[in-house]
């Protein structure tokens, strides 16, 4: 949300002077794709891709509300948590998932790590379901804590990758898909773009996918 915030990031990673620096808007996924293309075209042999989010620089729920349609949605100030609540309610009413399944996700997360906010862990699903709603049907444990974070990945072309690592992980392809952001224009309980990407990536054999990370 802050103009030219990438400049401080370049200072942090020590790229002085940066040999070949490029920055993209939106998220690090686009930066990853740009670096991937540069490797494929032979412009570079290696690339450091990084992305970061600094939610503490502003009021995140207000910022995200201002990214919605300025005529029909933004005047209502629906923040991301409220819209996630709409999506959760649609899924519950349609029988796509249950409140117990939602609580199980939170319980599994608590078993792996503590949260960065004041939300306390629980020992059972019933304990979580007894907690009050924050944005019905969401409780605080259903909502990701607002935090600052960063991620990075090093890409290398074929021979260079084998030189740097005995068993490197390979990127086999990318799929670009998008769905309308207009509230009410699509079914919030399904994601056609995710389904189409999975089919394209596997040649239609989606059952071969062992692990998938899906985020929004």
Language-model segment annotations:
Residues 75-78, 96, 185-188:
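Charge-dense, low-complexity intrinsically disordered segments
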Residues 91-98, 197-208:
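Phosphate/pyrophosphate-binding loops at sites that engage ATP/ADP/AMP, CoA/4′-phosphopantetheine
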Residues 58-63, 114-117, 183-184:
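Short acidic, glycine/serine/threonine-rich loops at helix termini
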Residues 6-7, 88, 198:
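Generic structural marker for isolated residues within well-ordered, non-membrane alpha-helices
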Residues 103-104, 133-200:
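Condensing-enzyme catalytic core mediating Claisen C-C bond formation in acyl metabolism
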Residues 1, 47-52, 100-107, 166-176, ...:
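Beta-strand segments within the central parallel beta-sheet cores of soluble alpha/beta enzyme folds
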Residues 23-53, 81-118, 153-160:
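Active-site-proximal alpha-helical scaffold in enzymes
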Residues 2-50, 54-83, 122-145, 172-179, ...:
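Conserved catalytic cysteine-centered active-site region
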């Amino acid at each position: 949300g802050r103009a030219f915030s990438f400049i401080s990031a370049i200072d942090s990673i020590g790229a002085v002077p940066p040999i070949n620096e490029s920055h993209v808007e939106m998220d690090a996924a686009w930066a990853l794709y740009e670096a991937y293309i540069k490797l494929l075209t032979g412009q570079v042999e290696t690339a450091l891709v990084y992305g970061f989010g600094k939610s503490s620089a502003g009021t995140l729920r207000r910022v995200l509300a201002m990214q919605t349609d300025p005529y029909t949605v933004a005047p209502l100030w629906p923040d991301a948590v409220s819209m996630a609540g709409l999506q959760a309610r649609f899924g519950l009413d349609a029988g796509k998932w249950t409140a117990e399944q939602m609580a199980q996700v939170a319980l599994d997360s608590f078993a792996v790590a503590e949260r960065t906010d004041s939300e306390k862990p629980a020992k059972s699903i019933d304990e979580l379901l007894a907690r009050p709603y924050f944005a019905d049907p969401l409780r605080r444990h259903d909502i990701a804590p607002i935090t600052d974070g960063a991620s990075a990945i090093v890409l290398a072309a074929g021979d260079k990758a084998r030189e740097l690592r005995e068993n490197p992980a390979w990127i086999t392809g990318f799929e670009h898909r998008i769905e309308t952001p207009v509230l009410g224009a699509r079914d919030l309980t399904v994601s056609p773009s995710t389904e189409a990407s999975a089919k394209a990536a596997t040649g239609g054999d989606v059952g071969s996918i062992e692990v998938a990370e899906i985020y929004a």
